[in-house]
Amino acid sequence: MTSVNLSYPIGEYKPRESISKEQKDKWIQVLEEVPAKLKQAVEVMTDSQLDTPYRDGGWTVRQVVHHLADSHMNSYIRFKLSLTEETPAIRPYDEKAWSELKDSKTADPSGSLALLQELHGRWTALLRTLTDQQFKRGFYHPDTKEIITLENALGLYVWHSHHHIAHITELSRRMGWS
């Protein structure tokens, strides 16, 4: 039996050197499907299951769902800033502190699921209009001190989505919920 890394069930993110138009198109399609896959992973869970951490010391399923909404809202804004400003410095946020706010710990996930559905609809509509040149635009991340291109950010957020959905589905598998 293969052991799953509970922190990184799909492995760590590895940026690509070059990204083809076909790869970007595939990622956009995947990003569009994320809200439905997340909803499918959590829609039949009880409150007790939603409040179960995906690993010791990890977030609960509920916190993961709300984190995805928080994170992807920030990413969408970063894309818009990068398209309208010259290499903007983004404002990082403390995702751990956000996950400890009461709404992240207690709110019904349905609000974040609905938000993600609409957000990903807008985000992918925007992404489908971008030229290769626009995908080369980027933002400066002061924590990593790097410029992140939009095409690499797209790949990162596809990975981020799969990463957290895998936290949930792997927990469900281990607990015998699915």
From Swiss-Prot:
Cofactor note as given: Binds 1 zinc ion per subunit. Is able to bind nickel instead of zinc.
Region forming the signal peptide: none
UniProt entry keywords in alphabetical sequence: Cytoplasm, Hydrolase, Metal-binding, Nickel, Zinc
Subcellular location: Cytoplasm
InterPro entries: DinB-like, DinB/YfiT-like, Put_metal_dep_hydrolase_YfiT
Listed Pfam families: DinB_2 (PF12867)
Entry keyword Lipoprotein: no
Protein name listed in UniProt: Putative metal-dependent hydrolase YfiT
Organism the protein comes from: Bacillus subtilis (strain 168)
